[in-house]
């Protein structure tokens, strides 16, 4: 991935389609903008005598603003700033994020001295437990056993629907941030209705994939084929580490199931169409138009027993999921649930699980990998 080196300021756009910006207007704009920025950033320093403001130190006064405003506004910063080790990009926003991170860590460190049982101490203890790899190693899979035992109790498709419903997550945002894929088989987002502005609607969005995108399962690209092989190996290895026999066969079944789910899902481009927000289904529509899933069991376990109306963002994904629940062997679904229970919590399982999860993360993501301390902080927040 190309390194992004962000000086933290926007550049003025060049004139479009040959349009001429009058010099007087440009000069007035630059003077007003520069004066406002200087005033807003330098007042505190001028009052306490600490010397040049942060903004003034980023400026290269040797450059005439009208010739190259970017070089004028950022030249000093670019000369004095180097890219920190392990970072692909660095700018004022990154500096602020790092400053906030250090402050949060300090707060958590202080919270470790709070009275036992207090809210602050519980937060600090959570982070400390995440970092205590020796204790994690000693516990083995004990913390995961209740989840795996719950999967073992699934004896029919109604029980399966309940367990799938329990896994619904509010981790999507189709209208705002364009998040069209949930970690659960379906994601929920409550957003403003497009027809009744004073009302909110319950949006249902596709999910259920272990890889980031449907194309990771369906594309014939050699890189995607290699990624699928890597993912299958992760499934096999985690099931093996957890003590499940026939792990190779189980891994193939899980990958085949996720591939089938992906085939019915919407592409990124199709999912980005806001006309999807106009597809309203009642509870009875799910029963009639997406047979195969016990929707009453699913929604009840998801905590949506009283919700009667939904906006379905990707219709084919819902009907496809229901069809897979109806047709796919129950044991394949149970292996799917077993693997995802293990993978979801791999970072707080013994080192072999965490290492395998990190290896898959490296295969699917670019950029520097977060340290355990960074992952612990993210989990705590």
Describe the role of every protein-language-model region:
Residues 1-18:
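N-terminal secretory signal peptides that target proteins for export/translocation
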Residues 25-38:
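Bacterial N-terminal signal peptides
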Residues 44-46:
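Boundary at the C-terminal end of the N-terminal hydrophobic targeting segment
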Residues 48-57:
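Short, Gly/Pro- and small/polar-rich lid/capping loops
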Residues 56-57, 62-65:
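A charge-rich, low-complexity, intrinsically flexible signal that marks solvent-exposed coils, linkers
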Residues 64-68, 72-135:
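Active-site-surrounding "flap" and adjacent substrate/cofactor-binding loops of secreted or lumenal enzymes
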Residues 111-381:
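Noncatalytic, helix-rich "gating/capping" subdomain that lines the substrate-entry/channel surface
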